[in-house]
Design a protein with these regions (language model features):
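Membrane-embedded helix-loop-helix hairpins and adjacent transmembrane boundary segments
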Residues: 1-489
Length: 489
């Protein structure tokens, strides 16, 4: 299909997004931007969060990783279920009881200002790396299938896409994103199931026959039983639970949408519904990956990893499937980037600049400052995407989860210490602990050959990081003379 036609489809899709944004952002204010005026429909939030949770990294990398790890990602998926249950029944009641706009305000009331700012700072770092890595992956695919042939440079593609995101989130924030993410999730899931349907047709297989062939070729293996392997089943399941606990339950972007729902009960239904949908969708992505690796030898495709999906679709499937793939790919791109920029803006304004505590600023001045911060993060996203272009790792899902182990570990330690103890901290030393723990983890990972023998660290590095922060916080704490105002839910 002509790159020019595909480009026109891209523009038409964005025009639709702008229409939705215009309709939902009228009469928006700062509360609309930060928490959607606390009036978001839980079903819309749950459905839209599927797109945010999955992102372009899932769309491209999870099917691509089947060639290396088979269905091993299913171990992490099992852990996700336990993690969501923990968020629903441990963290959400706490956030609603305290009526939080930023979830890191909890750390301020319980542990102190430095702990509060450390938590917000690590969230900013986490989302900045994670969201830009996801954005890079999808931009790179779009560049390869459309824009290289039109002579458009990579940096300009990224700049224009970020400009598009700014246009439809600049005013409405969360109030707009709840609706645009719903539209984009619909397109992404439609693309996923359409690709599965067409791949089965190309291979002339039913679902049971396809699974049988995957089994014969070793593509359907889920569990790894070698305890020294980074993919050992118990490590992966436990790590999956902690990934959700931190990357959803302690993540302002994900919780910002969740706590925009009016009541705790509806918010809990939102996350439980999200969990059920994610199990089906991620299993479908693994199945699609198996189909791609069954089809590749037949079609003479040599691409692997993150490149196999786009190579098969754009080079070997009908034009209709190519259009569906493009729309689904764009739909996977925007939710992970728009929500991240909005959440980073919220966290920086509320937690770092203290915009809601500023009595000396008018509502208009606060809105102007918030828009400047929003623009600043968009420019920072551009720089980070160009950095990942320079790195050019062949499997970005691994990079994203590895980065999460380092940046979400301090959040895990801070929240765990606040909820599991009643001790008070030496607030000045908190940054030393939260920065020191990831450095120790990096040294441990680099020297694991000498320190751990045949054992290889995997995603459990997140738990090690969190445990080091917890131990460090305990070391700089003392028994509280009065009961803390905020401890647990």
């Amino acid at each position: 299909m002509s790159p020019a036609l595909l480009f026109c489809i891209l523009i038409a899709y964005f025009a639709l997004l702008l229409g939705v944004a215009w309709a939902t952002s009228r009469n928006a204010n700062n509360d609309s931007f930060f928490i959607g005026n606390k009036s978001s429909n839980w079903m819309l939030v749950a459905f839209g969060m599927v797109g945010t949770t999955l992102s372009g990294a899932t769309f491209i990398s999870v099917p691509g990783a089947v060639g290396i790890d088979a269905f091993g990602y299913g171990q992490v998926l099992i852990g996700y279920v336990f993690g969501y249950i923990a968020v629903v029944y441990l963290l959400l009641p706490l956030y609603y009881r305290l009526k939080l706009t930023s979830i890191y305000t909890y750390l301020d009331g319980r542990l102190g200002r430095r702990a509060y700012q450390s938590g917000a700072g690590f969230f900013i770092l986490s989302r900045l790396f994670g969201a830009t890595a996801r954005l890079y992956l999808v931009v790179a695919v779009l560049q390869g299938i459309i824009l290289d042939s039109l002579g458009v440079p990579f940096w300009l593609t990224t700049f224009v896409i970020l400009g598009m995101i700014l246009l439809y989130t600049y005013q409405g924030g969360v109030k707009t994103i709840v609706w645009t993410d719903t539209l984009q999730t619909t397109c992404m899931l439609g693309g996923l199931f359409a690709c599965v349907y067409f791949m089965l047709g190309q291979l002339d297989l039913s679902i049971p026959q396809a699974l049988q062939q995957m089994h014969e070729r070793g593509l359907s293996r889920v569990f790894t039983f070698d305890p020294d392997s980074p993919n050992f089943w118990l490590k992966q399941i436990v790590a999956g639970a902690f990934i959700v606990l931190t990357m959803t339950g302690m993540d302002q972007e994900m919780m910002q949408k969740t706590i925009s729902v009016k009541t705790l009960k509806d918010s809990q239904k939102n996350l439980l519904a999200l969990t059920a949908v994610l199990v089906v969708v991620l299993s479908s992505f693994l199945f699609l990956g198996g189909l791609l690796y069954l089809y590749a030898p037949v079609a003479g495709v040599t691409a692997t990893g993150d490149k196999i999906f786009s190579t098969v679709v754009m080079g070997h499937l009908p034009a209709a499937v190519q259009i569906i793939f493009l729309i689904a790919l764009i739909s996977a791109l925007f939710p992970s980037a728009d929500g991240a920029i909005t959440a980073l803006t919220s966290t920086f304004c509320i937690d770092i600049l203290g915009i809601q505590r500023r009595q000396d600023m008018t509502e208009e001045a606060k809105g102007r400052l918030r828009r400047h911060v929003h623009l600043g993060f968009a420019l920072l996203f551009l720089v980070m995407v160009l950095f990942f272009k320079w790195v050019d790792n062949p499997s970005m899902i691994g990079v994203i989860l590895k980065l999460a182990s380092y940046t979400y570990g301090p959040l895990l330690g801070l929240f765990a210490f606040g909820m599991m103890t009643t001790r008070s901290l030496n607030d000045r030393l908190v940054p030393v602990v939260t920065i020191g723990a990831p450095i120790l983890c990096a040294l441990l990972e680099y020297n694991q050959h000498y320190l751990l023998g045949n054992y290889r660290l995997g995603l459990e590095l997140l738990m090690v990081n969190g445990a080091l922060v917890f131990i460090g916080l305990y070391a700089i704490s003392r028994r509280a003379t009065i009961k803390p105002a905020v401890v647990t839910a």
